[in-house]
């Protein structure tokens, strides 16, 4: 209920503004001030963190957390909007140590830093619609990337955020990337339920925009005829779970990013079997084990320039927060791939 209320609150604000006969110009100016303030906060935090890292020295790339708590483009439940703070809490909860499996220390700011969240709901409360909102997300990512050596690791949010994030990464780096996409679904509908920004359409937007050269989708087990047709249209390499045992060796020795601007990794938590991660909006049995995912990530060769972890839904998690810990572990191991 909370997610539905959050998703519709902005409509009532705009209606009240319209009833009060607020001019379109005045509304636009107000929206611009809110957006500028949001970007300024992220920019100043990124500058401060980057200055610290440069002063410390010895770092080429540091993973930088950026939360995008957006859930209204989900076709089912909007709980992923509440995920970023829960993931952060799980990262630092103290139930495990602060090292990644490869031995990188998360307490070292040269490995991981954080610039906070894009205030999605506050911006939407001002009547900002999705075309402009996606631009705000893209500009937020570019703001992080402007500060060397920060590289964005984005916390969703539903999977619609991957489109503006990948777009920003590609535009900022000056060319396409290769994408490793782990998911139960291909998210490549042209416009799911008429919404071009649906979480089920994000990779259609990415591919038609030319922001990726190769798109590898791993863990797929809920795919329609349109999903397969769209995959063929865009030359997507789709690896379905029904053939995973045959594909395992290849997927655990991937080499990506040569000849392009690097590798982007997008992890939808529902790529995992729900036995490992029940706190997702779209539960789809028959998925990857957590160790399957880690083997793919750990063995991947390529320069990982950015990534995201999406579709964790805290409202469907277990009482003890098992899926939050899973999402946090994914963030930790992606941090190890990005930082250097």
Curated annotation (Swiss-Prot):
Pathway: Nitrogen metabolism; urea cycle; L-ornithine and urea from L-arginine: step 1/1
GO cellular-component term (any): mitochondrion
Protein residues bound to Mn(2+) 2: 183, 185, 268, 270
GO biological process terms on file: putrescine biosynthetic process from arginine, via agmatine; urea cycle
Cofactor: Mn(2+)
Transit peptide, residue positions per record: 1-24
SUPFAM superfamilies associated with the record: Arginase/deacetylase
Residues binding Mn(2+) 1, per UniProt: 159, 183, 187, 268
Keywords: Arginine metabolism, Hydrolase, Manganese, Metal-binding, Mitochondrion, Transit peptide
Catalysed reactions listed for this entry: L-arginine + H2O = urea + L-ornithine
Location in or out of the cell: Mitochondrion
Annotated cofactor note: Binds 2 manganese ions per subunit.
Enzyme Commission number(s) of this protein: 3.5.3.1
Family annotation (InterPro entries): Ureohydrolase, Ureohydrolase_dom_sf, Ureohydrolase_Mn_BS
Record-level Gene Ontology MF annotations: agmatinase activity; arginase activity; metal ion binding
Pfam family, any one: Arginase
Chain positions recorded as substrate binding sites: 185-189, 193-195, 311
PROSITE patterns: ARGINASE_1, ARGINASE_2
Signal peptide: none
Family listed: Belongs to the arginase family.
Function noted in UniProt: Catalyzes the hydrolysis of L-arginine to urea and L-ornithine. The latter can be utilized in the urea cycle or as a precursor for the synthesis of both polyamines and proline.
Protein name: Arginase 1, mitochondrial
């Amino acid at each position: 209920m909370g997610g539905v209320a959050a998703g519709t609150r902005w409509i009532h604000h705009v209606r009240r503004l319209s009833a009060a006969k607020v001019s379109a110009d005045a509304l636009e100016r107000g929206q611009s001030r809110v957006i500028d303030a949001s970007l300024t906060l992220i920019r100043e935090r990124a500058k401060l963190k980057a200055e610290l890292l440069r002063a410390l020295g010895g770092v080429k790339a540091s993973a930088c957390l950026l939360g995008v708590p957006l859930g209204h483009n989900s076709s089912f439940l909007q709980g992923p909007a509440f995920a970023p703070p829960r993931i952060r809490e799980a990262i630092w909860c103290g139930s495990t140590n602060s090292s990644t499996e490869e031995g990188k220390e998360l307490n070292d700011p040269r490995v991981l830093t954080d610039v906070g969240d894009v205030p999605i709901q506050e911006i939407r409360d001002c009547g900002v619609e999705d075309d402009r909102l996606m631009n705000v997300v893209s500009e937020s990512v570019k703001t992080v990337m402007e500060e060397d050596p920060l590289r964005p690791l984005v916390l969703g949010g539903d999977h619609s955020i991957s489109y503006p994030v990948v777009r920003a990464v590609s535009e900022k780096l000056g060319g396409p990337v290769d994408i490793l996409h782990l998911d139960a679904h291909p998210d490549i509908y042209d416009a799911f339920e008429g919404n071009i920004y649906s979480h089920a359409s994000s990779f259609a937007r990415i591919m038609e925009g030319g922001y990726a050269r190769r798109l590898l989708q791993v863990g797929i087990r809920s795919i329609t005829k349109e999903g397969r047709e769209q995959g063929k249209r865009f030359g997507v390499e789709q690896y379905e779970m029904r053939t995973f045992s045959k594909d395992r060796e290849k997927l655990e020795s991937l080499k990506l990013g040569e000849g392009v601007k690097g590798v982007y990794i997008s992890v939808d938590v529902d790529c995992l079997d729900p036995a490992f991660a029940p706190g997702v909006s779209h539960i789809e049995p028959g998925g990857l084990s957590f160790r399957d995912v880690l083997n793919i990530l750990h063995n991947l060769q390529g320069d990982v320039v950015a990534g995201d972890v999406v579709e964790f839904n805290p409202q469907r998690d277990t009482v003890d927060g098992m899926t939050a810990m899973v999402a946090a572990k994914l963030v930790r191991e992606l941090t190890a791939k990005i930082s250097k």
